[in-house]
C-alpha cells in the first residue's frame, strides 16, 4: 500500500474541479480549521484569477478543507502547481481540526517570494467561473506538461 498524506487547502484547491484537473483524482474531504493561520490575498497575481496565500497569525483560525489520503503522484503535481521550488509557497506540516479530531496534514503557506505582495483578504467567491475555467483549461494543462518534462 502506498503512503498517503492529508492536505489542508484554503484557496483555489477548495474547488474540487481544480484539484481533479491537477491530480486526476477526486478526494474525500472534511471541513477543517487550521489554528494560528489566516488566508490573505495578493496585490499582484500571475494568474487571471485572484490568488490567496496562507500566513501565520497567532490567535486566528483559517477555515478550509482537508483532502484525505493523497498519494505521492498527486502530491508531486500539487507541489509543482504551488511552485514550492520557486519560493512562492512552502509546504509545511500542520495540525488541523476536523469533525472534532486532530489530523496531521501538510499545507501550502506563503513563501518568501510572495511576502511583499500580501494585500487584503481573499474569498473563494472572488474567483469567477471564467477565471476558474481559465485555470483548469489553460494554466493546469501547461503546468502538467512542464511537470512531465521534469520527470526523470
Name these PLM-found stretches.
Residues 1-152:
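Glycine-aromatic micro-motifs
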Amino acid at each position: 500500500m502506498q503512503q498517503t498524506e492529508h492536505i489542508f487547502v484554503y484557496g483555489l484547491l477548495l474547488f474540487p474541479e481544480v484539484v481533479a484537473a491537477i491530480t486526476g483524482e477526486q478526494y474525500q474531504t472534511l471541513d477543517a480549521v487550521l489554528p494560528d493561520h489566516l488566508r490573505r490575498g495578493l496585490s499582484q497575481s500571475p494568474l487571471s484569477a485572484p490568488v490567496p496565500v496562507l500566513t501565520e497569525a497567532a490567535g486566528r483560525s483559517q477555515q478550509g478543507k482537508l483532502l484525505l489520503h493523497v498519494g505521492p503522484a498527486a502530491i508531486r503535481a500539487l507541489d509543482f502547481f504551488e511552485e514550492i521550488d520557486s519560493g512562492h509557497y512552502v509546504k509545511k506540516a500542520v495540525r488541523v481540526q476536523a469533525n472534532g479530531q486532530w489530523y496531521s496534514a501538510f499545507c501550502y503557506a506563503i513563501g518568501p517570494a510572495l511576502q511583499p505582495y500580501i494585500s487584503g483578504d481573499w474569498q473563494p467567491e472572488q474567483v469567477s467561473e471564467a477565471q476558474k475555467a481559465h485555470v483548469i483549461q489553460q494554466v493546469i494543462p501547461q503546468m502538467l506538461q512542464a511537470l512531465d518534462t521534469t520527470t526523470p
